[in-house]
Amino acid sequence: MSFVVIIPARFSSTRLPGKPLVDINGKPMIVHVLERVRESGAERIIVATDHEDVARAVEAAGGEVCMTRADHQSGTERLAEVVEKCGFSDDTVIVNVQGDEPMIPAVIIRQVAENLAQRQVGMATLAVPIHSAEEAFNPNAVKVVLDAEGYALYFSRATIPWDRDRFAKSLETVGDTCLRHLGIYGYRAGFIRRYVSWQPSPLEHIEMLEQLRVLWYGEKIHVAIAKAVPGTGVDTADDLERVRAEMR
């Protein structure tokens, strides 16, 4: 099947300035991400950035760049700018891969594209089971609850579903009911255009989760269980050191 991958790579980062260009074993992080995405079989790969240094690094590695504005409020807004500049048709399948995931398995990039293509829905994503209490109660690990058909009922930083009987006895174990959302999305290009036309929702401001805008406006997001678990993403200097060690 045919799909396009867009990799947003914003230069500014509060916790890790110049994040796309941090060195991981001799290469900028954004180049590692580009190499993983190439393994997915995507028809076209575009790095969306607001900084010339990132553009030069990507082009030196043979990648395609789309320069975007620096004032976008969300990654989806940056995607929408690329969709318009490139003139993608409404039915083009677009996969959004984060620029700070140098260990993302190629198989899940293709998986989210295929899941979207097989369904009459505008958006798809992935999740993995949570097995540790530490992760279940960590607000940085976004949880998702699904319906019987695999569509998202809600995303939250809170621990959902709350296992009343289990947690009344102990918070040391979590059972097998919690799912962690992975930050990879598949969209049809026309859906991205619609998304950015909607006003932000109260829920997305409360949770700081932009996918809640989709549910707020009554649209569906399909969620599949990922075929592979991604390695560590890079949000902080400590994450960077872990990734460097794991990728040696």
From Swiss-Prot:
GO terms for molecular function: 3-deoxy-manno-octulosonate cytidylyltransferase activity. Its main location: cytoplasm. Pathway: Nucleotide-sugar biosynthesis; CMP-3-deoxy-D-manno-octulosonate biosynthesis; CMP-3-deoxy-D-manno-octulosonate from 3-deoxy-D-manno-octulosonate and CTP: step 1/1; Bacterial outer membrane biogenesis; lipopolysaccharide biosynthesis. GO terms for biological process: CMP-keto-3-deoxy-D-manno-octulosonic acid biosynthetic process; lipopolysaccharide biosynthetic process. It comes from the Bacteria. It is an enzyme of class 2 (transferase). This is 3-deoxy-manno-octulosonate cytidylyltransferase. It comes from Salmonella dublin (strain CT_02021853).
